[in-house]
């Protein structure tokens, strides 16, 4: 009914690390943290009869089956993080299988996680390779791969009024198209080559090297600045102004 909720489970074989079956968790302004590990089965299973209401949530697992709903309270400080338990794993977001697999609409009104002002996939302190395509998000979205690679293989669409942060110490690449009000690069040590023709309004952050193309007016560095390393930058717009 309120406060923080923490659960963890670790099993071998095909059993489930944490299974929420018909559970009703109401944490109010608190945080729900679930850590589930299974050597061959699912780390975390949330069945369709389960509902979780909370301000913040942290799901830490290498495999997940998410059928129930996890709902934020809409507070400006609220966030949800979905990240791997083990380092050097793959996160498939909207495309692919065989890793920590998330539906592309996970953070939208049509998905299972709703109402959080910040939606984070990955962990800034633990390497993962993130592949994203066919993704829609209703609020701010962060992809964070630490020393791993982010591949934008298909469309990544963030609702109007919100932005996408790409955080990597390795590389950010792909031909998928990003649609968002803003893109922020947390990639001072990474080569960023995004070859799709994107539909954003603002580009800020840091990258070691940058290639980026936009389909309309683009303001570069207007919010927090844009710092590019020795690799230089190639930024173009196919229509409109670059300022």
PLM segments and residue spans:
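Extracellular lectin-like interaction modules
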Residues: 1-243
């Amino acid at each position: 009914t309120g406060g923080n909720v923490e659960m963890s489970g670790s099993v071998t074989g095909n059993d489930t690390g944490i299974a929420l079956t018909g559970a009703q968790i109401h944490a109010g302004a608190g945080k729900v943290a679930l850590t589930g590990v299974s050597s061959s089965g699912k780390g975390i299973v949330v069945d369709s009869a389960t509902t979780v209401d909370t301000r913040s949530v942290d799901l830490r697992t290498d495999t997940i089956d998410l059928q129930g709903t996890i709902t934020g309270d809409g507070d400006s400080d609220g966030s949800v993080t979905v990240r791997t338990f083990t380092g050097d794993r793959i996160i498939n977001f909207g495309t692919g299988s065989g890793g920590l697999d998330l539906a592309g609409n996970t953070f939208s009104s049509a998905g299972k996680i709703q109402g959080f002002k910040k939606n984070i996939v990955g962990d800034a302190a633990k390497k993962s390779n993130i592949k994203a395509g066919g993704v829609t998000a209703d609020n701010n979205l962060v992809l964070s791969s630490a020393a791993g690679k982010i591949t934008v293989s298909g469309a990544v669409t963030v609702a109007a009024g919100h932005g996408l942060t790409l955080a990597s110490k390795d590389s950010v690449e792909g031909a998928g198209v990003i649609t968002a009000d803003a893109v922020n690069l947390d990639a001072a040590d990474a080569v960023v080559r995004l070859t799709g023709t994107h539909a954003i309004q603002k580009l800020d952050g840091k990258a070691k090297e940058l290639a980026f193309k936009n389909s309309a007016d683009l303001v570069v560095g207007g919010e927090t600045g844009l710092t590019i390393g020795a690799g230089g930058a190639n930024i173009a717009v196919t229509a409109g102004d670059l300022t």
